[in-house]
């Protein structure tokens, strides 16, 4: 069963009917990384990736993301990758894998809210 917490960026159990393609990285038969994509619309498939903690910082996420993006293109779909800008590791993976920022989502919060989040300063 792949619909578990450790693969929650690559696959989405609540929307498993949209998961259409995946690629994995293995070491000695053990799945150590997984990239999956969901058909969020007819023409564009979203890529998500997870790598087991002990295998991170070895280029596995980028290799999986890049490979899956090429596979998506072979299906005549547009691959896309979403992450929060605060998730710096994920944003770096996207850029390393050949993606470029196309849009940015912003959230506005009151100054009081921000001050409280910053320790009441």
Regions of interest found by a model, annotated:
Residues 1-14, 121:
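Short amphipathic alpha-helix that is part of the acyltransferase structural core
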Residues 85-93, 98-99:
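Short, highly charged C-terminal tails/helix-capping segments
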Residues 14-44, 49-52:
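A conserved beta-strand-loop-helix scaffold within acyl/acetyltransferase catalytic domains
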Residues 31, 53, 70-74:
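Long alpha-helical, hydrophobic tracts
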Residues 72-84:
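Conserved GNAT acetyl-CoA-binding A-motif
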Residues 44, 52-63, 88:
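Conserved glycine-rich acetyl-CoA-binding loop
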Residues 100-117:
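Conserved catalytic-core motifs of GNAT/GCN5-like acyltransferases
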Residues 57-71, 92, 96:
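Conserved acetyl-CoA-binding loop-helix of GNAT-fold acetyltransferases
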């Amino acid at each position: 069963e792949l619909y578990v917490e450790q693969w929650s960026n690559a696959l989405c159990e609540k929307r498993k009917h949209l998961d259409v393609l995946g690629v994995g990285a293995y070491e000695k038969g053990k799945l150590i990384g997984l990239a999956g994509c969901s058909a969020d619309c007819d023409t564009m498939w979203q890529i998500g990736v997870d790598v087991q903690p002990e295998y991170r910082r070895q280029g596995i996420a980028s290799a999986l993301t890049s490979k899956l993006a090429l596979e998506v293109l072979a299906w005549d779909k547009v691959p896309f990758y979403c992450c929060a800008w605060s998730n710096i590791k994920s944003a770096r993976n996207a850029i390393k894998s050949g993606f470029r920022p196309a849009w940015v989502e912003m959230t506005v919060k009151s100054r009081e809210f921000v001050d409280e989040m910053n320790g009441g300063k």
